[in-house]
């Protein structure tokens, strides 16, 4: 069983896996280590991209990302997603690094958890701020899991590519098979929208 993006990259490299659905960071690793190639991408809400975001509770006193990285944010609690998450860890960490901020030193406590837990804990005021992705926040609001007015977006990344369907380097050489895979994915796409 593959349980990490690194494991999936190795599985594609050694021929155990021929086709995989993976997030942006997983694809970067798989392309780098196994020369995996994208053959399709997923459209969510009709769009090929999404955004990393940082959220806070409106009562936290953190009204902007400048507050978060400035003296007002020092000593606060910040939550990242797991360390393999593009939107929950890598992109926000990159932003902090660009600002000269080491999260482990700037914040009083840094936690690593699941995307839904970040939103739930921020809205409950259990953590001051956290990293997530826009679709997760929207979905949780739509499903009534959190209230929009209790989760304030204070930062948004540049667009990030959605999940990719990638194939091994060996499979990619078979252009006829790649075309059949692409056609099959396109054919089942509407059915997945009806019955996910």
What do these predicted ranges mean?
Residues 1, 25, 48-124, 135:
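Bilobed "Venus flytrap"/periplasmic-binding protein-like clamshell domains
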Residues 6-20, 33, 50, 115-135:
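Short helices/loops that flank or line small-molecule/ion binding pockets
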Residues 9, 30, 88-90, 119-121, ...:
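Extracytoplasmic/secreted cell-surface and envelope-processing proteins
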Residues 13, 17, 32, 70-73, ...:
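Sec-exported extracytoplasmic/periplasmic mature domains
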Residues 18-20, 27-51:
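Short beta-strand-centered segments that line the small-molecule binding cleft or hinge
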Residues 19-21, 40, 55, 77-79, ...:
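Structural recognition of the beta-strand scaffold that forms the well-ordered cores
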Residues 21-34, 97-98, 123-124, 128-149:
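A ligand-binding cleft/hinge motif common to bilobed small-molecule-binding domains
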Residues 43-53, 145-185, 189, 195-196:
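Periplasmic-binding protein-like
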